């Protein structure tokens, strides 16, 4: 039995793909710049899925964060990677995603967790709307717990207690265009 190695696409400072590396070897104290994606998932009631990272995660264990993050594989679009991770991480069906909207296409961040592990990613941010009747059943090794939150209540919590949330989520939600897109999607529901 062979296990397929998950690859991450490495990037240069201009945002060009320059190669790949196994995901298991990338997140270290000297993490190279690489491609990723970040998602904010809305249910049909317009609530946002907020997840608490599993305690077994290598980086930011137990921290509350956005709905889902991940890495597109070589020759994989962000939309396809989002669907793949939605199935693998959150237990969703591949056709659960009604709409995947890229809101912050040029988002990039670098953050260091308490253990010294670095995240350094070119990480477009997406807003995802789920179909009616879809249920989230996260894998235990990915998500410790989850909540559905009204967008404005989540924004207020992030503003009041940013230390409770992942640094990328706090930074992403400081972008007015992301908050506006979330509120517009919430109001449309």
From Swiss-Prot:
Primary location group: cytoplasm
Annotated positions binding Mn(2+): 27, 34, 71, 119, 121
Name this polypeptide is given: Isopentenyl-diphosphate Delta-isomerase
Positions of Mg(2+) binding: 89
Known role: Catalyzes the 1,3-allylic rearrangement of the homoallylic substrate isopentenyl (IPP) to its highly electrophilic allylic isomer, dimethylallyl diphosphate (DMAPP).
Cofactor field: Mg(2+); Mn(2+)
Keyword 4Fe-4S included in the entry's annotation: no
Pathway membership, UniProt: Isoprenoid biosynthesis; dimethylallyl diphosphate biosynthesis; dimethylallyl diphosphate from isopentenyl diphosphate: step 1/1
Residue span(s) of domain Nudix hydrolase: 32-171
GO molecular function: isopentenyl-diphosphate delta-isomerase activity; metal ion binding
Organism: Corynebacterium glutamicum (strain R)
GO annotation, biological process: dimethylallyl diphosphate biosynthetic process; isoprenoid biosynthetic process
Subcellular location: Cytoplasm
The record's free-text note on cofactor binding: Binds 1 Mg(2+) ion per subunit. The magnesium ion binds only when substrate is bound. Binds 1 Mn(2+) ion per subunit.
Keywords linked to the UniProt accession: Cytoplasm, Isomerase, Isoprene biosynthesis, Magnesium, Manganese, Metal-binding
Family: Belongs to the IPP isomerase type 1 family.
Keyword Cytoplasm assigned: yes
Enzyme Commission number, as recorded: 5.3.3.2
A GO CC term attached to the entry: cytoplasm
């Amino acid at each position: 039995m062979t296990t397929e190695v998950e690859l991450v696409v490495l990037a240069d400072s201009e945002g060009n793909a320059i190669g790949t590396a196994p995901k298991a070897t990338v997140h270290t104290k000297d993490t190279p710049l690489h491609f990723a994606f970040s998602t904010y998932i809305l249910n049909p009631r317009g609530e946002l899925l907020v997840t608490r990272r599993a305690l077994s995660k290598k980086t930011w264990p137990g921290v509350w964060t956005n709905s889902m993050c991940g890495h597109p594989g070589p020759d994989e679009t962000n939309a396809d990677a989002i669907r793949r991770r939605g199935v693998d991480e959150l237990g969703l069906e591949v056709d659960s995603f009604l709409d995947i909207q890229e809101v912050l296409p040029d988002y990039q961040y670098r953050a260091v967790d308490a253990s010294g592990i670095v995240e350094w990613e070119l990480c477009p941010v997406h807003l995802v709307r789920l179909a009616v009747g879809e249920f989230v059943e996260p894998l235990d090794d990915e998500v410790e717990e989850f909540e559905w939150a009204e967008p404005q209540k989540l924004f207020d919590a992030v503003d009041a207690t940013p230390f409770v949330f992942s640094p990328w989520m706090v930074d992403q939600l400081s972008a007015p265009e992301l908050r506006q897109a979330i509120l517009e999607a919430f109001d449309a529901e």
